[in-house]
UniProtKB/Swiss-Prot annotation:
Function: Probably involved in the RNA silencing pathway and required for the generation of small interfering RNAs (siRNAs).
Gene designation per UniProt: RDR5
Protein's UniProt name: Probable RNA-dependent RNA polymerase 5
E.C. number(s) listed in UniProt: 2.7.7.48
Organism whose genome encodes this protein: Arabidopsis thaliana (Mouse-ear cress)
Annotated spans, Disordered: 103-122
Catalytic function, reaction form: RNA(n) + a ribonucleoside 5'-triphosphate = RNA(n+1) + diphosphate
Domain of life: Eukaryota
């Protein structure tokens, strides 16, 4: 009888078998009998797994007879779900949404909900002792171990008992043990990851997929700057770092062994079945290309980021810890972020859903108490007061992308946020005593809505209120899902910040030249900038100016050194200044000329309605300005993308924004939005170039603004996402990812290069070549339309083509292509002039000496030995880091050593006293400089990157013996600008 029963033993899926083993162990119960196994196998696998998962989660000691308990639950489940279900008349997506709503409302029911995890386990491959043992560890330990055995199967390199021995080790000791036992045998040294796992940083878990479907793993730590802000994407913040997997698919070359008619058959299988990491499954969720800036680059550098998320897990550790998406399908999971199934097209679906991938800082506010007020857009009207329609017969609007936020909410937003990071340290309490940001670029996820744009401070609004317009709502709420929970958040991307040093661009130089700005204007700027650059090695004012202008390169380290009186010929400082000089020259060659009395400001619409059609209101540090200003927006190519407008004082604006600063307001009058006239701009965060430079205003002659000449957009004939079944939707979305990642055309970049090439030749032709110039202008206008259409094509699902007749065969020499001609346009002259300058840069010093102030200070042998070992470890790690990912890995190593040195992310956050830090900094200085004497001056960089603020304070107190004055870098820039 026993032999017969063994032969007909019912096989269950791998994840159910694993869950049952976890139940036996947790509840101290004997395995279920064959009859119970038969009952479990009679219901859908996903329902069976959900049932045993809930059994596992019960408190130990509550179950006395596992067989009868499971059978009763199976009977309840069958009764509740009514399997088998008859087909109904609803569409697949309609049934799905209806089921989701039903399940949300019955979440407290004792009967299990019929959630679908969409992917089946293959046989019992998961049911191996080593994977079960891994499942008892927290995930970061699992991932680290698997990343140290690339190409190996865990069951073949280690036993389950060995894994369990490491279970309770602290992460540092665990990493060392795993590396010693496994990593050094199977993993390159450069891939060793000794991260600050408990530092609070965002960690990015990465999976690299080869064409044959094999995986390797890697974990990266987000570099969040000196303040260690918790910055990340909405996706990572909601689910947690370890539940989001960045997946990089290698391109499949035709010559590879995996090449077939369907080149990406293997990848599609992975998208369908998911990626197993231990006993966790991750499935395709969202992708995002590099945005407009990325599209302008060469296609070989194009990056499309693909993210999988954790769906289910049979790991013992995971089953003991609640997960917000347990039992949810991918379709359902997306709806918890936004009701994206309402998107009209597939292209729009993913373009809007990828808003959850913006790098943001969360506004810490109770979203349940916010008043979410929808207001109308401001329409453009003709002389008769009628709505003006665009080429697609939609109303033109003045308020595209901008709404309002109440003062109390705005005050909760820190000042100086840029791309989700705080540029300076300040608490919310400190911010309450300052003027709030005037404009806030944001992403808002609220009750199924996804909103994108800017909030203008409105002191007139009731507290805890935001007002959004239809142009800001990218995904609207599904009324049928009123009881469906969503991950609500107000995420800040950028605030209206003080302008940085403003530079021109190649496009802007070309357009200004076309508009009548003489070559002498640009060449004078060039000459003056180069002259000042030459003096940075002996003129402290020039050196400080350069250090401040490029302060983001070294966290203002060089500026600190200069300000405390360290000589300019100090080896590291002298070497760094030469790097700045090279950087400045490269910028100048690319047309990035610094221009005075010019600013980049975030734009919005005038809330008062006071501005006339040709007026703007500009608010700078000193308040509103008056007079003519030149206005432009990158990446404008059209001759009319540069406007001359009148900056006007608007008293009534103060009632809205008070004393908040740094923005440009456009009028809400006229038949067309001024923002749209300037390179198709809007007000969802676009930055506008504003200049009151007298030479530009005196000489520039504006042209008629751009008007699109391309035909209306074709209506999308494909099925809407809501008409697809969840399975069909996933297939279509992953196909879109493959196209974007491996087959996207680079129309934007090629069109921009083609335009610049034709524009370059156009600028040097005389009036006697009128016919030829007219033909060239016609081509440029075609390219401009193609370029602007291509910028918006992804979210519309349009395909934009660039005719070969518009592509040049030869390019200006300053573009540094293989096929080139010698350009004599202003851009060619700038390039040649910079290249011809043989600036007398000091050669690297063959004799590196220490500053007496540091060398003569006694340091204990204890600190010297400690720092010597520390520096040896650093050099080993940095050598390995430079073999891969160079800048990224090198910065990560530096940041890790700063963390260790200060016990915090940087000097500003350290709780260590200067008396504690001084001996360590001095010891490190002596050791590093002794090494640099033989290895080269570039090796001095490490001690200044890590301990620079401490050394500067020691020098100031010991050498200068002067009182320290506190000064903000922005004030110094203003004084030296």
């Amino acid at each position: 009888m026993n032999q017969a029963s063994s032969r007909i033993r019912i096989a269950l899926s791998g994840r159910i078998e694993t869950a049952l083993e976890n139940i036996y162990r947790k509840h101290n119960l004997t395995p279920i009998n064959d009859e119970t196994r038969q009952r479990l196998s009679s219901i859908p696998e996903n329902l069976g797994f959900e049932l045993v998962r809930k059994v596992f989660s019960l408190q130990a000691g509550l179950i006395y007879n596992l067989d009868s308990f499971i059978v009763s639950k199976v009977n309840q489940a069958v009764s509740f779900t009514g399997y088998p279900q008859p087909a109904n008349s609803l569409s697949p997506s309609g049934r799905h949404v209806s089921r989701v709503l039903q399940e949300e409302m019955s979440v407290d029911s004792d009967a299990p909900s019929p959630k679908s995890l969409k992917s089946e386990d293959k046989g019992g491959s998961l049911h191996i002792p080593q994977l079960v043992a891994l499942g008892e560890l927290e995930f970061k330990k699992v991932f680290l171990l698997l990343s140290y055995i690339p190409g190996q199967h865990v069951g073949q390199v280690i036993t389950a008992d060995e894994i369990r021995l490491w279970k309770d080790l602290p992460m540092v000791e665990y990493e060392a043990a795993v590396w010693d036992r496994l990593g050094r045998h199977y993993c390159p040294q450069k891939d060793r990851r000794m991260l600050q796992w408990d530092s609070g940083k965002t960690h990015y878990y990465q999976c690299n997929v080869a064409p044959n479907g094999s995986y390797t793993f890697k974990v990266l730590s987000a570099l969040q700057g000196p303040l260690l802000e918790h910055t990340g994407t909405h996706l990572h913040k909601v689910l947690g770092d370890d539940n989001v997997l960045t997946v990089k698919f290698a391109d499949v070359q035709k010559s590879s062994s995996t090449y077939s008619i369907d080149h990406y058959f293997t990848y599609k299988g992975i998208a369908k079945n998911g990626i197993m990491i231990g006993l966790r499954r991750y499935q395709f969720f969202v992708f995002k290309d590099g945005g407009k800036e990325e599209k302008k680059k060469d296609l070989s550098t194009k990056k499309v980021k693909c993210y999988f998320i954790r769906t289910d897990s049979t790991a013992f550790y995971d089953m003991q810890n609640p997960y917000i998406l347990t039992g949810k399908s991918i379709y359902e999971a997306r709806m918890h972020f936004m009701h994206v199934h309402r998107a009209p097209t597939l292209a729009n679906y993913m373009a809007r859903f990828s808003l959850i991938l913006s790098k943001t800082k969360t506004l810490e506010v109770d979203m349940t108490g916010i008043t979410f007020d929808q207001i109308d857009d401001i329409h453009c009207h003709d002389q008769d007061g009628k709505d003006v329609l665009d080429k697609n017969k939609k109303p033109c609007i003045h308020s595209d992308g901008t709404g309002y936020i109440s003062e109390d909410l705005a005050r909760m937003c820190p000042l100086n946020i840029f791309k989700g990071k705080c540029l300076r340290s300040e608490s919310i309490q400190e911010a309450c005593y300052q003027d709030p940001p005037l404009l806030i670029q944001f992403r808002m996820f609220y009750d199924g809505y996804a909103v994108k744009g800017t909030f203008l401070l409105n002191k007139k609004l009731c507290p805890r209120t935001v007002q959004v317009r239809p142009s800001m709502i990218k995904v609207s709420k599904d009324p049928s899902l009123s009881n469906f929970s969503t991950f609500n958040a107000l995420e800040v991307v950028t605030t209206s910040n003080p302008p940085k040093r403003t530079k021109l661009s190649k496009n802007l130089v070309a357009l200004l030249s076309y508009g009548g700005i003489p070559n002498e204007f640009f060449l004078d700027i060039l000459l003056n900038t180069l002259e000042e650059s030459k003096s940075i090695f002996y003129n402290k004012r020039a050196a400080l100016n350069a250090a401040l202008n490029y302060g983001e390169m070294d966290d203002q380290n060089a500026a600190q050194m200069i300000l405390v009186g360290i000589p300019l010929d100090e080896p590291h400082l002298k070497n760094y200044l030469s790097i700045l000089l090279k950087t400045e020259k490269n910028d100048l060659k690319a047309g990035k000329l610094p221009v005075t009395e010019s600013y980049y400001l975030m734009g919005t619409v005038d809330p008062t309605g006071a501005l006339k059609e040709d007026e703007v209101c500009v608010i700078l540090e000193s308040g509103q300005i008056s007079g003519e200003v030149l206005v432009y927006r990158n990446p404008g190519l059209h001759f009319g993308d540069i406007h001359i407008l009148k900056a006007t004082y608007v008293k009534a604006l103060e009632e809205y924004v008070g004393n908040s600063k740094f923005a440009v307001f456009f009028p809400q009058k006229g038949p067309r939005s001024l923002g749209d006239e300037i390179a198709g701009g809007d007000f969802d965060g676009d930055m506008y170039f504003i200049s009151r430079n007298p030479e530009l205003l005196e000489n520039f002659k504006p042209s008629e603004p751009w008007v699109s000449l391309t035909p209306p957009s074709k209506s999308n004939s494909g099925r809407a996402p809501s008409q697809l079944s969840p399975e069909e939707l996933e297939e279509e979305l992953f196909e879109m990812f493959l196209t974007a990642g491996f087959h996207a055309s680079n129309v934007i970049g090629i069109a921009a290069d083609s335009w610049l090439t034709i524009m370059d030749r156009f600028l040097i032709l005389g009036d006697d070549r009128a016919e030829e110039k007219a033909e060239m202008k016609k081509k440029m206008l075609e390219l401009i339309d193609i370029y602007y259409d291509a910028l918006d094509a992804p979210k519309k699902g349009d395909k934009v083509y660039l005719p070969n007749k518009l592509k040049p065969d030869i390019f200006p020499h300053y573009m540094e292509r293989d096929k080139k001609f010698q350009s004599t346009s202003i851009l060619g002259l700038i390039f040649d002039f910079v290249k011809s300058q043989t600036t007398e840069e000091p050669s690297p010093s063959s004799e590196i000496s220490k500053l007496p102030c540091f060398e003569d200070e006694p340091v204990s042998e204890f600190h010297m030995q400690k720092c010597r070992l520390w520096y040896d470890n650093y050099r080993t790690e940095m050598t390995q880091a430079m073999k891969t990912d160079k800048d990224e890995s090198a910065n990560e190593v530096i940041q890790r050593y700063k963390q260790e040195f200060y016990g915090a992310a940087g000097f500003e956050d350290s709780k260590k006293s200067l008396e504690e830090l001084y001996p360590q900094a001095l010891a490190l200085y002596k050791i590093v400089y002794d090494y640099a004497i033989h290895a080269g001056v570039s090796k001095c960089r490490f001690v200044w990157k890590v301990a620079g603020p401490v050394l500067c304070r020691f020098y100031l107190n010991k050498k200068m013996q002067e009182k320290c004055l506190v000064c903000a870098p922005s004030v110094l820039k203003e004084l030296w600008g």
